[in-house]
UniProtKB/Swiss-Prot annotation:
Organism whose genome encodes this protein: Schizosaccharomyces pombe (strain 972 / ATCC 24843) (Fission yeast)
Segments of skewed composition (Basic and acidic residues): 7-19
Record's protein name: mRNA cap guanine-N(7) methyltransferase
Compartment(s) of residence: Nucleus
Highest taxon of the lineage: Eukaryota
Catalysed transformations (reactions): a 5'-end (5'-triphosphoguanosine)-ribonucleoside in mRNA + S-adenosyl-L-methionine = a 5'-end (N(7)-methyl 5'-triphosphoguanosine)-ribonucleoside in mRNA + S-adenosyl-L-homocysteine
Family from the record: Belongs to the class I-like SAM-binding methyltransferase superfamily. mRNA cap 0 methyltransferase family.
Keywords: Methyltransferase, mRNA capping, mRNA processing, Nucleus, RNA-binding, S-adenosyl-L-methionine, Transferase
Residues the entry annotates as binding mRNA: 92-93
Length: 360
C-alpha cells in the first residue's frame, strides 16, 4: 500500500532523455483495445474525486494499515538516501524496474495505460515515466499517501498524464472507484500490497475481479509479494513455542503458534516489521498456488514468477539489467552488484510475478 506499494521506494531524480533499454522479446503478444487519445486524462482536474464513491472500511486490520501509512512522512529524495536500509530500498526498486521493463508493453502506435493499485506515495512514478507510458491512475487506501503521490507527480514533470484516487481496490468494485471512461488499462501493478487482500477470500475475489475487468486480452498484472515458500521454510525451522524470526532489519511474528499448513489459504495473519519502513503492521500469508488457482478463475494466467534473489542471480550480469543496477547504485558493502548482509535476508522474503489476461 503505501509501500503499494512500495513498502520501500527509492530512486534517483529523473534526468532528461534518460531511458532504460527496452527488451523486445517480451512483448510479442497482441493486446486488444479500443482507440485512445493521448490526452486521455486531460479533461479531469486530477483531484482524485471524480467517479469515486467513498467506501468506508470497518475492518480493524485495514484501519491499522491505513493509519500506519498515513502517519509516515514523505522525507524527500535527499533525506531518504540516509535511510538505514537504503541498499534494500534501492534493490527493491531495481526489482520493480526489471518487472516493469520485462512485462509492460513498449508499443508506439497506441497509448499505454497503467493502473497502480496500492500506489502509496507514488514511489514508482519515475519507473513508469522511463517505461514510456501515456496514462497512469494510482489508487491507495491511505489518503495522505495519495496526496503525497499527487505532489510527487506534479514536481517530477512527467511525460504521462496521471490521476490519483483514495480508495480500496480490495473491498470496492472498480465500478465504484473509477468513472466508466477510466476502467481499461494495459497493465495493473500491485507492488508490496496484495498480501493485505488475503485477509479474506472475499477481498481476494474483489481484487481479482477488478483486475480482470480492467485488462483486455493480453493485458498483464504484475506485482511483488511475500514468498509463501520462504515463510513455510522459516516456520519449519522454529523451535516449539517460537513464533517469530528475522534479524535487526526485519521481523516476522505470528500472534499465535505459526500454522503448519495454509489451509484454508485466507486470513493467516502475521505481524511484519521493517526498519525505517513498516512498524509491526498486520499482514497476511499469500499461499502462491492458491493465489494462482483463484486467478485462473478470472482469466488471469501465470506467465512468470521468481523469488527476488533468483532475479538478482539471473539478471545482475545481463546486458540490460546489470548496468541498470549500476545506475541505481544497487551494490553490496564491497561495491559489487547486489545486496548483502541482513538486507539480503530481508530481500529474500519476497517474490515477483506476472499474469496475463486470457479470454475476454
Amino acid at each position: 500500500m503505501s509501500s503499494s506499494n512500495s513498502r520501500v521506494h527509492e530512486e534517483q531524480p529523473p534526468t532528461e532523455n534518460r531511458r532504460y533499454a527496452r527488451p523486445t522479446a517480451q512483448m510479442n503478444r497482441v493486446i486488444e483495445q479500443q482507440p485512445r487519445r493521448r490526452d486521455y486524462f486531460q479533461n479531469n482536474d486530477n483531484s482524485g474525486r471524480r467517479g469515486y464513491n467513498r467506501h468506508e472500511n470497518n475492518g480493524n486490520a485495514q484501519d491499522v494499515v491505513r493509519s500506519h501509512y498515513n502517519a509516515r512522512p514523505d522525507l524527500g529524495y535527499k533525506k531518504r538516501q540516509f535511510s538505514p536500509i537504503i541498499q534494500l530500498k534501492r534493490f527493491n526498486n531495481w526489482i520493480k524496474s526489471v518487472l516493469i521493463q520485462k512485462f509492460a508493453p513498449h508499443a508506439s502506435d497506441y497509448p499505454i495505460l497503467v493502473l497502480d493499485m496500492g500506489c502509496g506515495k507514488g514511489g514508482d512514478l519515475i519507473k513508469w515515466d522511463k517505461a514510456g507510458i501515456d496514462g497512469y491512475i494510482g489508487i491507495d487506501i491511505a489518503e495522505v499517501s495519495v496526496n503525497q503521490a499527487k505532489k510527487r507527480y506534479r514536481e517530477m514533470h512527467a511525460s504521462f498524464d496521471a490521476l490519483f484516487y483514495a480508495g480500496d481496490c480490495f473491498s470496492s468494485s472498480i465500478n465504484e472507484l473509477l468513472p466508466p471512461d477510466q476502467r481499461k488499462f494495459d497493465v495493473v501493478s500491485l507492488q508490496f500490497c496484495m498480501h493485505y487482500a488475503f485477509e479474506s477470500e472475499e477481498k481476494v475475489r474483489v481484487l481479482l475481479g477488478n483486475v480482470s475487468k480492467c485488462l483486455p486480452r493480453g493485458g498483464v498484472m504484475i506485482g511483488t509479494i511475500p514468498n509463501s515458500d520462504v515463510i513455510v521454510k522459516h516456520i519449519k525451522m522454529l523451535k516449539p513455542g517460537e513464533k517469530e524470526w528475522g534479524n535487526d532489519i526485519y521481523k516476522v511474528r505470528f500472534p499465535e503458534s505459526p500454522p503448519r499448513s495454509f489451509r484454508p489459504p485466507y486470513g493467516i495473519q502475521y505481524y511484519f516489521y521493517l526498519e525505517d519502513a513498516v512498524t509491526d503492521v498486520p499482514e497476511y500469508v499469500v499461499p502462491f498456488e492458491a493465489f494462482r488457482a483463484v486467478a485462473e478463475g478470472y482469466n488471469l494466467e501465470l506467465i512468470w514468477v521468481k523469488p527476488f534473489l533468483d532475479i538478482l542471480n539471473e539478471e545482475k550480469n545481463s546486458e540490460t539489467y546489470g548496468p541498470l543496477m549500476d545506475r541505481m547504485k544497487v551494490v553490496d558493502n564491497e561495491g559489487h552488484r547486489g545486496i548483502g548482509g541482513q538486507e539480503k535476508e530481508a530481500a529474500g522474503f519476497y517474490l515477483a510475478f506476472a499474469f496475463e489476461k486470457r479470454g475476454i
